[in-house]
Design a protein with these regions (language model features):
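Internal helix-loop-helix
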Residues: 2-102, 148, 154
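A short, Trp-centered hydrophobic/proline-enriched beta-strand micro-motif
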Residues: 99-112
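FAD-binding core of flavoproteins
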Residues: 109-197
Length: 197
C-alpha cells in the first residue's frame, strides 16, 4: 500500500493524474480513465507496482469500482432521473482532496451457490439493506477476501453476481468507512506470510 503513495512521488508522470474536480494532482488509483492513454498508464502503473512489491498492492478493485461507478451511476440517472451520479462525484471529489485509499468489497460468502441471495437460509451470506432513512441506507451481511479493506480508508461494497427482482435488498453499491461501527474483520494467516523475499 505504501508503495502506491511512494510511486506517486517518485514517478508522478506514471502514478498521478490531474483531477477534473479539484484541478490538483491526484494518485492515479483515484483517477477516472478519460481516454485510452489513461487506461494504458493505469496498466503500466500496476505492472510497475507488481515489479516493486511482488505482491498485491490492494488498490485495484477500488480503482476499477470507481471507474465502473462513474459510468453506471450516470446511466442510471439518465434512465430513472435519480441523482446517484452527482452523489458519486461529490464523494469522488472528497477522495481526491484527501488522497484516500478505496478498497473494493465484492466477493460474497455465497452459502448454497445453487440459490440466489433471497433464497439462502442465512440472509447474512450476502450484504443487504436492512434500513433506510434520511441519512442513507444501513447494510448487514458478509463479504470475503477483503484484505485490502483493512488498509483502506473507505470500502466500496458491491454485489458479486447478477440479481433477480426478488434480490432488490441485495442490489446495493455504496461506500463505507472501514472503521465504521459494526464492522468486524476476521483476518487469517496468508499462505505466503513466511515466503523469502
Amino acid at each position: 500500500m505504501a508503495e502506491t503513495y511512494d510511486l506517486a512521488v517518485k514517478e508522478p508522470e506514471l502514478a498521478t493524474a490531474k483531477s477534473p474536480y479539484t484541478g490538483e494532482s491526484i494518485n492515479r488509483f483515484l483517477h477516472i480513465a478519460e481516454n485510452k492513454e489513461d487506461l494504458f498508464l493505469q496498466n503500466k502503473m500496476q505492472r510497475k507496482l507488481g515489479q516493486l512489491t511482488g505482491t498485491c498492492f490492494q488498490r485495484c478493485v477500488g480503482m476499477d469500482a470507481f471507474n465502473a461507478l462513474h459510468s453506471v451511476t450516470f446511466e442510471i440517472d439518465e434512465k430513472y432521473k435519480t441523482n446517484y451520479h452527482d452523489n458519486f462525484i461529490k464523494f469522488l471529489t472528497e477522495m481526491h482532496k484527501y488522497n484516500l485509499v478505496i478498497g473494493g468489497a465484492m466477493t460474497d460468502v455465497k452459502g448454497d451457490r445453487s440459490k440466489l441471495p433471497h433464497e439462502q437460509e442465512d440472509e447474512d451470506l450476502y450484504l443487504r439493506i436492512v434500513d433506510r432513512n434520511e441519512k442513507g441506507v444501513y447494510v448487514k451481511g458478509a463479504k470475503a477476501h477483503q484484505t485490502g479493506c483493512i488498509n483502506s480508508h473507505w470500502m466500496v461494497v458491491m454485489p458479486t453476481l447478477r440479481l433477480s427482482e426478488n434480490d432488490k435488498d441485495y442490489a446495493i453499491v455504496g461506500a463505507i468507512p472501514v472503521d465504521a461501527e459494526g464492522i468486524t474483520y476476521i483476518y487469517g494467516r496468508q499462505s505466503c506470510d513466511t515466503r523469502s523475499m
